[in-house]
């Protein structure tokens, strides 16, 4: 394998790893509440079973990492790449904060406010990524769709409780 392939492979693994790390940090706050607080609160009829969320989020974090890699490999010397990846890191932080607020603090209302910021951060990431790599932007489509659904669930849980 030549140097460039090794370098790109390391970037891909790093980008996915950083993205998954955000999910792991969020899960530290999520897991203790899934079988206690979250199991007891009222949820909307279309709320998926708890076991669905782990595989969905693991997949979405991997897709985020692939998208970030497609942007990163264009080169950090480019201003648009730096901006796009900075926005990306910001949305990862918002993503992690949602788990802390919703599951850690048991605050559906606070999490509802936060998920609005997350949604706009994802939209900003998609726009910034599209300027660098259209495929990277499209790879994030399932993510913003899922967060839109999660926002509906969050709102419903807030109303029901």
Features from the language model and the residues they span:
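Membrane-interface helix-boundary motifs at transmembrane edges
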Residues: 3-7, 72-82, 130-137
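Membrane-interface helix termini and inter-helical loops of multi-pass transporters
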Residues: 32-46, 160
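Membrane-interface loop-to-helix entry segments
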Residues: 48-63, 106-118
């Amino acid at each position: 394998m030549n140097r460039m392939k090794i370098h790109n492979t390391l970037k891909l693994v790093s980008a996915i790893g950083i993205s998954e790390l955000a999910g792991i940090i969020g899960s530290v706050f999520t897991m203790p509440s899934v079988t206690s607080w979250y199991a007891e609160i009222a949820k909307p009829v279309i709320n998926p079973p708890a076991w669905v969320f782990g595989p969905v989020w693991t997949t979405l974090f991997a897709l985020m990492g692939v998208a970030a890699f497609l942007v990163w490999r264009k080169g950090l010397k480019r201003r648009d790449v730096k901006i796009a990846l900075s926005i990306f890191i910001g949305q990862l932080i918002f993503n992690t904060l949602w788990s802390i607020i919703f599951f850690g603090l048991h605050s559906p209302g606070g999490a509802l406010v936060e998920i609005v910021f997350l949604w706009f951060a994802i939209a900003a990431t998609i726009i910034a990524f599209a300027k660098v790599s259209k495929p990277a932007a499209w790879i994030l489509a399932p993510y913003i769709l899922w967060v839109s659904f999660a926002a509906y669930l969050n709102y419903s849980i807030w109303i029901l409780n």
